[in-house]
């Protein structure tokens, strides 16, 4: 589902965790639909509120890891189209896990 770009040594989040992440979301054609990597601080999000693909990937990551992960539509938004994301899209995310609350 993905590969590690940078290795961390911190804790691994649980589904109930709040994670602090930098991320960039792209379609398979390279179009970026979301990107917070230029912010001065990572976003804090409750893991259980995110798409299933993020549940799977982040529960395998350690704080300090950076991954690129490929999320099939069934673990993303499925048949729902969102702004900038067509229905049934495979999603590509670069995710850096910066912390766990």
For the regions a protein language model found, what residue spans apply to each?
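Cross-family detector of peptidyl-prolyl cis-trans isomerase
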Residues: 1-101
């Amino acid at each position: 589902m993905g590969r590690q770009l940078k290795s961390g040594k911190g804790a691994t989040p649980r589904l109930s965790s709040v994670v602090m992440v930098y991320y960039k979301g792209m379609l398979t054609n390279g179009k970026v639909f979301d990107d917070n990597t230029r912010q001065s601080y990572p976003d804090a999000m409750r893991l259980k509120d995110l798409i299933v693909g993020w549940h799977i990937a982040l529960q395998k990551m350690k704080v300090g890891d950076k991954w690129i992960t490929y999320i099939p539509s069934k673990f993303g938004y499925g048949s729902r189209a969102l702004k900038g994301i067509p229905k049934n899209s495979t999603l590509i995310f670069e995710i850096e896990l910066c912390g766990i609350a």
